[in-house]
Amino acid sequence: MSSRIGGKSKRSGELLAQKLQSEGISNPAVLKAIAHSPRHIFVPEILAHKAYDNTALPIGQGQTISQPYIVAKMSELLLADGRPQNILEIGTGSGYQTAILAQLTDKVFSVERIKALQWQAKRCLRAMDLHNVAMKHGDGWQGWRSKGPFDAIIVTAAPSSVPPALLDQLADGGRLVIPVGEQTQILKIITREGDVYNEQQVEAVRFVPLVPGDLL
């Protein structure tokens, strides 16, 4: 795995960050994380030549690695109120979003229901020498209560409605970035002020569904 990381990928990451900046991503920390993350190790080798295109790609198990713009946009939204000390990620998937988050906070807690994806993501994070990520094989709808509350929560698949457990695990003053919906999905920001949750709609998006229940 580590042999797949080299100078060429560093340059490719920098070019991708420049492209995302031209499309409106402005947070320096997010752009730096994108530039320093070898996206090609998070996709199947047969698709590595497309890794630095601004497009979603299949990673197996009916899942995808999100479009880099969406990864950057959601990360930027998480940081809008400052640097969170901890982040809960629902849907580890390829681990690419996880790798970006790990460069933006002290600790990432990531939940994935498909064990094979979790194993692969762990290998990629080790290859990047990122060690501030804890992973759980679990139902994303339930979050990770024992590790909360969380300054920020990001959901990388779309539930039909906002899971109540995630609202409960959001710290006072924290923010949740989540795509919601079935056929039509909207990216939302939910901020917590005591027992009050304020919701803001960002833009239309397209994600795989956040499946509750059985683990794979």
UniProtKB/Swiss-Prot annotation:
GO molecular function: protein-L-isoaspartate (D-aspartate) O-methyltransferase activity
GO cellular component terms listed in the entry, alphabetical order: cytoplasm
Keyword annotations: Cytoplasm, Methyltransferase, S-adenosyl-L-methionine, Transferase
InterPro entries reported for this sequence: PCMT, SAM-dependent_MTases_sf
Transferase is among the record's keywords: yes
GO terms classed as biological process: methylation; protein modification process; protein repair
Top class in the EC scheme: transferase
Catalytic activity: [protein]-L-isoaspartate + S-adenosyl-L-methionine = [protein]-L-isoaspartate alpha-methyl ester + S-adenosyl-L-homocysteine
Protein location: Cytoplasm
Pfam annotation, one family: PCMT
Residues spanning the membrane: none
Superkingdom, natural source: Bacteria
Positions of the catalytic residues: S66
Enzyme Commission number(s) of this protein: 2.1.1.77
Function: Catalyzes the methyl esterification of L-isoaspartyl residues in peptides and proteins that result from spontaneous decomposition of normal L-aspartyl and L-asparaginyl residues. It plays a role in the repair and/or degradation of damaged proteins.
Family: Belongs to the methyltransferase superfamily. L-isoaspartyl/D-aspartyl protein methyltransferase family.
Protein name, as recorded: Protein-L-isoaspartate O-methyltransferase
